[in-house]
Amino acid sequence: MARTEPVQPHAAAVFTPSVILSFDVEEHHRIEAAAGLSVPASMQTEYASRMETVTRRLLDRLACTGTLATFYIVGEIARSHPRLVADIAEAGHEIGGHSWDHRRVHRFDARGFAEDLRITKDALEQDAGCQVFGFRAPTFSITRETGWALDVLAESGYVYDSSIYPVRHDRYGIPDAPRSPFVAVGPGGGSMLELPPVTYRMMRQNLPVGGGGYFRLFPLWVTQRSIQQMIATTAPPVAMLYFHPWEFDAGQPRLPLKRISRFRTYVGVKKCYDKLESLLNTQIFRRAIDVVAELHDLNGPLPRFSLGEGVHVVSARITSSGASARPVSPARSP
């Protein structure tokens, strides 16, 4: 299988318009809509098996199209499916953290969140044989109420984050956050390079069209047009898409969810794989870490966005309090 090679520094500060493909990998019953449900052990076992099956199917399809992606994986999968994590990394994809068991940031205090970040990062790095640079909070749960998480992240060894969605939503979102890459600053002054998901700007509002249920609900052209708008109108021109392996499992047993949650969770699942197939055949994708490496070579500043008081001056170059070195693409240990 292909091995990921380090990215070399760019001589020119010219940024390549980029579309990032990412997957948030958790088992079917770990989704936020199922929080608090009592899921039988037999169903959990089936979901674990189906998660691996559909993830490997996605890996095969990505290999056929020569596409590299970023996989944000919950730590418990590193424990239960270590070979899967290793195979994702061995195929050249980036491994990122996605918490230990898909708990939202709101359910932690700072100490608990720091420990969750640590054990997840350690477990993934052990299986993948390479460093983990990126993090995405479950359900994009870094919001104004949990801005303190940026201070914790900045001291955790991660280089970038993809947890802030610049939209209005009942579960997440900071609607006035920048739509393109920016430096997010926590109330304690910790800063992280932030890669937000795709939005579509219309009537002074950001519409959430970057993946998940929105991708399943809307026609494919909505996603395609949103990518075009992001590349044409934002700077740096970056469009981040996100999906979940369970969304490509049309035959999965349904969880006993309430009506609205059931609709949000399962709408469009049967057509999701075909829509992704169309994107893979028409769009060139990159890993998040490769975009981050290129952003680090830019000479100009990125927008700064504060989630609290006590903000220190953020360098014009992209740095974070906890990981200021320029990242290279993760390479597996020999």
Question: Where are the regions a protein language model picked out?
Answer:
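Catalytic alpha-helical scaffold of carbohydrate-active enzymes acting on polysaccharides/glycoconjugates
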Residues: A2-G134, T139-M203, V222-S333
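Surface-exposed cleft-lining segments at the edges of enzyme active sites
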Residues: L207-L217
